[in-house]
């Protein structure tokens, strides 16, 4: 699929890298409800692929922009995830702002899409300890690497991660720059979208948005 066709399928946004951090009209999602401070976000389901004790809570954060609450993962698990229950996208895009706060083993922030359950989904993540962006698929609970690319990921700073996906085409952006453009057919059909971390990563998320592609 060429760039122009990919762009049209996404409704005039994306794969050419011109609008990575712009949220167009019609996008769903947004911030997290202050009524859920100290608790898991309403309308989301959270867990960890491979076990562990993840802790997903909505927290106050004065650095998030307009003092909006953030979703924070402060526990530990092999691959913690938290997905929005009412989402089902086969093709489209998903975007989030994230801040790596701490972690000795990892300082990762990621996105999941075509999420069928805790053992089957795609994930793209950025890691402040490794300074890279990577793309994986998870099947039957086993994570497989598709691509790694070096990228600057400063700890303690906000970054914007975005994934665009149509058919077998996947594009991954960090802070407005496309780092990965890959073809893969392991996981197809509609699934949920959400956020992801790894190991002991303590990570904050805000401005979670998504949309299905134009038909």
What are these regions (language model features)?
Residues 11-22:
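Bacterial N-terminal signal peptides
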Residues 26-49, 206:
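Extracellular carbohydrate-recognition regions
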Residues 31, 187-215:
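Ligand-recognition surfaces built from glycine- and aromatic
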Residues 32, 94-96, 157-172:
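Short tryptophan-centered beta-strand motifs in secreted/extracellular beta-sheet-rich domains
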Residues 39-70, 77-78:
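Extracellular glycan-recognition surfaces and repeat-rich motifs
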Residues 73-135, 139:
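Secretory/extracellular carbohydrate-interaction modules
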Residues 139-160:
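Short, aromatic/His-centered strand-loop micro-motif at the edge of beta-sheets
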Residues 173-194:
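Short, solvent-exposed beta-strand-to-loop segments that form ligand-recognition rims
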């Amino acid at each position: 699929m060429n760039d122009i066709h990919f762009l049209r399928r996404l409704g005039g946004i994306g794969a050419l890298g011109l609008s990575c951090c712009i949220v167009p009209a019609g996008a769903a999602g947004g911030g997290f409800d202050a009524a859920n401070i100290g608790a898991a976000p309403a309308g989301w389901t959270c867990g960890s692929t491979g076990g562990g004790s993840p802790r997903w809570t909505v927290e106050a954060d004065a650095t998030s922009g307009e003092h909006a609450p953030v979703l924070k993962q402060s526990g530990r698990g092999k691959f913690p995830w938290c997905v929005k229950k009412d989402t089902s996208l086969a093709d489209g895009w998903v975007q989030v702002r994230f801040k790596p706060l701490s972690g000795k083993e990892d300082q990762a922030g990621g996105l999941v899409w075509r999420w069928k359950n805790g053992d089957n989904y795609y994930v793209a993540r950025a890691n402040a300890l490794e300074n890279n962006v990577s793309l994986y698929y998870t099947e039957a609970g086993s994570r497989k690497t598709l691509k790694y690319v070096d990228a600057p990921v400063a700890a303690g700073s906000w970054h914007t991660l975005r994934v665009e996906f149509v058919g077998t085409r996947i594009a991954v952006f960090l802070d407005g720059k496309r780092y990965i453009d890959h073809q893969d057919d392991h996981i197809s059909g509609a699934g949920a979208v959400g956020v992801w971390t790894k190991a002991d990563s303590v990570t904050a998320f805000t401005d979670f948005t998504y949309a299905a592609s134009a038909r």
